Amino acid sequence: MLRHNVPVRRDLDQIAANNGFDFHIIDNEIYWDESRAYRFTLRQIEEQIEKPTAELHQMCLEVVDRAVKDEEILTQLAIPPLYWDVIAESWRARDPSLYGRMDFAWCGNAPVKLLEYNADTPTSLYESAYFQWLWLEDARRSGIIPRDADQYNAIQERLISRFSELYSREPFYFCCCQDTDEDRTTVLYLQDCAQQAGQESRFIYIEDLGLGVGGVLTDLDDNVIQRAFKLYPLEWMMRDDNGPLLCKRREQWVESLWKSILSNKGLMPLLWRFFPGHPNLLASWFEGEKSQIAAGESYVRKPIYSREGGNVTIFDGQNNVVDHADGDYADEPMIYQAFQPLPRFGDSYTLIGSWIVDDEACGMGIREDNTLITKDTSRFVPHYIAG
């Protein structure tokens, strides 16, 4: 894995506008950063990214299978007891999964380490699957990277294939909250993939969802919604006043309810419990287990429900705070994880996001930040394969 500087396309702003990339600049700061690129070899991708992703995903599914049968685990995950049975039903029925993203730290000379798995509401999808590929095509044409360079990126192909597998005569709704450019772009991109698969689809904001007679979900025209993709956390749905309606299983939500186990950072200590010493895992503990942290060991404290680095704190071996990100999750239960430093290139720390569609590892996106904690504003940097 090497990083090097490359020229920025002179008409980047226009290209972004033409492709609906409305957030390539966030708060007057660069988000999409194509002034540099990461180069990987095919062997690195296949052996160090793709293979571990596939193996870890299967391990995660084993955790789900154990968790739905174990009330102690569900309690540790802070999932409300009201939903235990319906989550187990969702898993036994093998309700559909669409996609997820594993976040890795990789220094290049040791196995990747899994930091967390967002299997419910992962973003940076549009950038990884679509806009990054446009950059690759332009970069090859202009000669700034080898003309035979490739990219670890079959995400869009797999998404379209997955929507073909999920095809139904009923409209597939796609929804997110209002006033979120990134979420809307992600959802519209997924809707486009569904349409390419031949699926009738409709967009609606979460705020515009209604309830009909008997508690059925409806759109603005009072049509009953039977299937919907939502870029809205499952734990928020469970805490909503209408959350108990999930137990009736009237609608098919994507992501499915069983994925609430995988999008929970409590997954990390469970993986360590069931697969201790695995080379791609970091030692991790629940709140009641933190006495197992070795004296002098640096560690990270994370809320079990947290997004975009919110309320993550890094401690050194003397329990001094090394870095902290503010957020809205300070009251959540915490997990503790052995600290794995991100590789540093210049002034930037680099995180690899490895994408999974259904059960298949299929692509990658790279984020950079000037701090050790990756956040929603962390820069997205393209990659390519050569050699």
Stretches with model-predicted labels:
Residues 1-387:
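Preference for protein termini
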